[in-house]
């Protein structure tokens, strides 16, 4: 057990979270379990493997078999592209859920972004000029509740991914932290669009001061061409199983996924390690993905001295430095200074009767009941609306992946507001540069 775990501070923290009544995301974390990284930076994990992120865009009606080494007889471009999308999605999971434990020894709580905080950067892909440049924009669009929206786009290959995330947390009797994600991701590859839901997770090892993330539940990847991938996550039990395990099944349509034997492919293994793929009616498996064979490409971010005051690394510079030094008193002092400044700004806005203007994202109403001028109404041909309809996914503000008629869908939830990137706002941006 670590030095912190044996201290009275750790004991006090365990007591506070075990007795806390409400959403734990609103509970301030003690300095010694903080990460020096803001949550706005997590958006970069979606594209840290540029080759895998862009590969689906390189597949066409003539070369699709060349892009499917584990099945040279893949039946169509649509199937090959879905397989490439699934492989890219699996590649993002290790960065999103394991990288901090691997680099810092255990999971740490990221810094909670303030309203209007932004994080931007790019992957120049100099060694692969055919990839072109990929841009990341991340913005904290809400503080109560915390919500981060992001957009990643590569204009050369006509690929983009956007989404937003919000979480609600709680504790079990065994002090396992449960996390329900809200929001979703939309991947656009030329003329195809994919709706991706994110899985619930739980954080174990808290009692022994060595937290780690384990995924549970399922994710959906629904394509505009009708194809569907259902990914089921599981972890290591007391007697059986391996950590970070998953099974993904690919179907021609959502109607077929009620019977697992309809799956065209079964992909299984560990999302943090190696996975294999088996085609329907075949007994031969092939390697699908090995996370150790594809190192991440880090985002290029401007030096802190060149950043806007709202950019994450500049805004949190003093706090992050204190965390790296392990200076508990300085962490508390610098963090409180920043947070008090933000509270003062919110109070000024309240007195003036104004609301903080988001830079690059707008809310869209899928029930068309919101009368605010800042909220747009979703059109009938909206990509999320159409893909959710194919999957029978609830468009309400319920946990990600909730199907129509599911337990959370039946609750009294009267809103269906989701954040969308507005590229015109980015094109008019004159203060923040990549």
UniProtKB/Swiss-Prot annotation:
UniProt binding sites for a 1,2-diacyl-sn-glycero-3-phospho-(1D-myo-inositol 4-phosphate): 24-29, 109-112, 143-144, 335, 339, 343
Gene assigned in the entry: HES1
GO cellular component: cellular bud neck; cytosol; fungal-type vacuole membrane; membrane
Physiological role: Lipid transport protein (LTP) involved in non-vesicular transfer of lipids between membranes. Functions in phosphoinositide-coupled directional transport of various lipids by carrying the lipid molecule in a hydrophobic pocket and transferring it between membranes through the cytosol. Involved in maintenance of intracellular sterol distribution and homeostasis. Plays a role in ergosterol synthesis. Binds and transports sterol. May be involved in ergosterol transport from the plasma membrane (PM) to the ER.
Organism whose genome encodes this protein: Saccharomyces cerevisiae (strain ATCC 204508 / S288c) (Baker's yeast)
GO biological process, one term: endocytosis
Region feature OSBP-related domain (ORD), mapped onto this chain: 18-371
Pfam family, one: Oxysterol_BP
Name under which the protein is recorded: Oxysterol-binding protein homolog 5
Phosphoserine carried by residues: 389
């Amino acid at each position: 057990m670590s030095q912190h775990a044996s201290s009275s501070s750790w004991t006090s923290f365990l007591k506070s979270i075990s007795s806390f009544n409400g959403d734990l995301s609103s509970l301030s974390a003690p300095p010694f379990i903080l990460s020096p990284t803001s949550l706005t930076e997590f958006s970069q994990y979606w594209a840290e493997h540029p080759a895998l992120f862009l590969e689906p865009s390189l597949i066409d009606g003539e070369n699709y078999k060349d892009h499917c080494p584990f099945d040279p007889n893949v039946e169509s471009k649509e199937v090959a592209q879905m397989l490439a999308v699934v492989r890219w999605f699996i590649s993002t999971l290790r960065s999103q859920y394991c990288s901090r434990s691997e680099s810092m020894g255990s999971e740490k709580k990221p810094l909670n972004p303030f309203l209007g905080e932004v994080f931007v950067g790019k992957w120049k892909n100099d060694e692969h000029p055919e990839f072109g440049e990929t841009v990341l924009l991340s913005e904290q669009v809400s503080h109560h509740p915390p919500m981060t929206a992001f957009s990643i786009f590569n204009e050369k290959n006509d690929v983009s991914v956007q989404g937003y995330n919000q979480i609600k947390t709680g504790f079990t009797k065994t002090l396992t932290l449960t996390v329900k994600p809200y929001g979703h991701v939309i991947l656009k590859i030329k003329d195809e669009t994919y709706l991706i839901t994110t899985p619930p997770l739980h954080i174990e090892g808290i009692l022994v001061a060595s937290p780690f993330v384990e995924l549970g539940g399922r994710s959906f990847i629904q394509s505009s061409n009708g194809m569907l991938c259902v990914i089921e996550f599981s972890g290591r039990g007391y007697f059986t199983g391996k950590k970070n395990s998953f099974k993904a099944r690919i179907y021609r349509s959502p109607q077929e996924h009620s019977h697992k034997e309809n799956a065209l492919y079964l992909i299984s293994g560990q999302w943090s390690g190696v996975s294999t793929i088996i085609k329907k009616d075949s007994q031969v498996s092939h390697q699908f993905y090995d996370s150790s064979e594809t190192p991440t490409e880090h985002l290029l971010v401007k030096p802190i001295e060149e950043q806007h005051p709202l950019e994450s690394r500049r805004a949190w510079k003093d706090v992050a430095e204190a965390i790296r030094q392990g200076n508990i008193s300085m962490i508390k002092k610098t963090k409180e200074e920043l947070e008090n400044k933000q509270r003062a700004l919110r109070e000024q806005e309240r007195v003036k009767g104004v609301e903080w203007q988001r830079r690059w994202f707008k809310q869209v109403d899928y029930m068309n009941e919101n009368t605010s001028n800042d909220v747009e109404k979703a059109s009938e041909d909206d990509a999320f609306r159409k893909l959710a309809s194919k999957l029978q996914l609830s468009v309400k503000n319920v946990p990600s992946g909730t199907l129509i008629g599911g337990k959370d869908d039946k609750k009294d939830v009267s809103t269906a507001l989701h954040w969308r990137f507005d590229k015109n706002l980015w094109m008019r941006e004159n203060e923040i540069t990549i």
